[in-house]
Every structure is written in C-alpha cells, then in structure tokens.
Amino acid sequence: TTAGSGAEVTSNAVIYVDGIKHSFESELLIPDNFFLIPEFLISAPNKIKASAGFDAIAQALESLVSKKSNDQSVEFASKSLRVSVNSYISFLKDPNLKNATEMSIASNLAGKAINISKTTAPHATSYPFTSLFNISHGHAVGLFFESFFRFNFDNLNRSETSFDLKKRFDLIFDLFDVRNIDDFSSKIKFMKKQAELEDNLIK
C-alpha cells in the first residue's frame, strides 16, 4: 500500500457512495497474504507520501488512547511509532530504500494496532473533509489532530478507559521524546509543517 493505510492487515473496508462513507468489517476481509514492497514508495508523489505517512502515525497514536486497546495493540503501536517518528520527515525529504522500508513496517504495525483497538475521534471527524472537500485522508485526519489529543489530556479525570490514560500519555511523550502535552503538540505541528500538510482550511 502507500505506507499509511495498513489495509493489508485490517478487517475493514470503506466504500463511498454519493459522497457518503460506508464501512464494512469482517475477518474475511483480512488478506491471506500480503507484500510490503518499499521500492514502490520511493517515487510516489510527496503529497501522497505525506498524507499516508501521517495517517500511519495517527493510527498508532489513536490506538494507544483507544478504549479498546490492549497489551498487544499497545505493543504494535509503540513499535510503529518508534520507527515512524524518526523516519517520516526523512522519507519525505530524502526518500531512499532504508526510510521507505521503515515507513512500510511502521504502517503495517499501525494497521495491526488499529485492527485491535480501532481509531478514535481524529479519524471519525476526517471523513466529511475527504468526501465533501476532497482533502486526502491522512491530511484530513491531521487537521485538528493535536487539538483532540490536548482535549483528552486536559480531561484525564473524565477518562472512561480501563487503563491509566495518564500512563499512556507518558508513553506517547517518551516515544516522541518530549516532556509534556505542549511539546507533543508542537512536535505534531512541526511534523505537519515539514510535510506541507496545511492546517488552514481557507487555503
């Protein structure tokens, strides 16, 4: 795939009919076999790589805070982010076999994570921007991404998770090599800027 969707390891499919998204889920949709071929990614347009790559990062992050997450999904998501956080920008600025391979693996791991935990609000709110305004999926997911995470962090006391959400955020901060939610938000904004994923809807 485009090193972003993780579709090769998920039980989900999406069809748009008259601009309306229809989702399907079945174990029968998981392929029996798949191939990760990073050579195909190197020459892809940067706009596609930027959007798809951010989608992989978003999937892993959303998986970590999902109410449906478990130990296995956390392991997949953490491994994904350890790779993608360090490879995403270089994959866009100077694509080569090494960083293309890393993003392929990161995407695959993120797909495995969300197949267990599913995604959360950033994905749920992205679909109208794609169907109505033709904003690519990963770009649409990123539009308000850090705002959703800040809201969750600022409302830890209202968490309905079966796990300690504060500890999950501590894990996220560690994976992004930041100290707090402000630094995390700044790093996400910086990554989007470097990837030329515009936040301004007017543009």
Regions inferred by a protein language model and the residue ranges of each:
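Glycine-rich phosphate/pyrophosphate-binding beta-alpha loops
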Residues: 4, 109-141
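Gly/Pro-rich interdomain helix-loop hinge
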Residues: 135-202
